[in-house]
Amino acid sequence: MSDVESGTLEPFSRDMLADPYPAYRALRERGRVQRTPAGHWLVLGYDEVSTLLTDQRFGEAAGRGGRIRLSRTQREGPHQLLGRVDTMLSQDPPEHTRLRRLVSKAFTPRSVQKMRPLIQEIVNELLDGLAGRAEFDLVSELAWPLPVIVIAEMLGIPRADRGRFKRWSDAMVATLGGDYSSLDEARRSNEELVEYVSRVIADRRKQPRDDLISRLVAAEESGQKLSEDEMLGTVALLLVAGNETTAHLVSSGMLALLRNPEQMARLREEPSLLPSAIDEMLRYTGPVHTTRRTAREDVRLGDANISRGEVVVGILAAANRDPEKYADPDRFEVARNATDHVAFGDGIHFCLGAALARLEGQVAIGTLLARFPNLRLRHNEPEWGGTFAIRGVTRLRLRSV
């Protein structure tokens, strides 16, 4: 019996990568909060996941290591790869509050919206390369290059160095996602990234520009500024968190449209639905599937009594398909307007790059639909990749004529 049929979680199995939702549904029907044989907790219901994300009795910092047994390689690997200090993702207040306030000053909605013309230009350039081609892989030609180029432009990185940024990001993402076979390469990439960004920071201190690193250098809150280590951690986090997840939003979102041609036709007819469609893609097939917290005190969550220090894994993707929250949750509807999904998390750790990811998705998918009216899937199935934390399409062959 497969893991999908039995309702168990085998994160790296072919069945789970191709379609984890039947297993999530089966697990949720057994219990919205349940203990695993390994001794930690899974949370699958929308309300319960929302509480996990917003209730400050659950924290981030205490959870690293937690009660999940890790090998030495696992313990020493991922947490060294986002700069030389903890990032916002691994901190609780008050340090998280201070750091997020400082970084937010350089990442305002206005700053993100100013990126729209540039993102449109990048998308146009990438799609120009597909003109006249009857067939192409959406992932390698658009979904993967786009976020790396956008992030490099935000940071003020020269075009000639984009390839290096892509290599650094790919190596670090693989390890942070659970692939420890490439740990040495990820460490080298981290060292190269730190050295490179340190030089850029030093340059921006002397000669500020209109870019994100200059804004990080200038950011100040109550007389406090970001240390160099904090800036390095923030840049590395942006590079890692903004690369794979946005790429998967574009590729998996397009796959959802192509598998639901009536919804794609409606979106073509009503392009004003594009913001709603992007949020539906995030709800229906969002790239981030899980997040982890640790109970900072004894907590009752749903019907479960969770003890202080116990690790709790929230399955965001299961919450986003909870029938108690969404009517007909396994149906993809571009007009659903599901802005309350938890694909970006919630609470103090809500994704700082959510507005940018939405904007990239809107520009990429909207332009693709406008320029390629005859898009359709090839007969072969798409290829899926990822881990228990992040999942997405890694190859998607399309025909355009």
Predicted regions and their residues:
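Cytochrome P450
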Residues: M1-V401
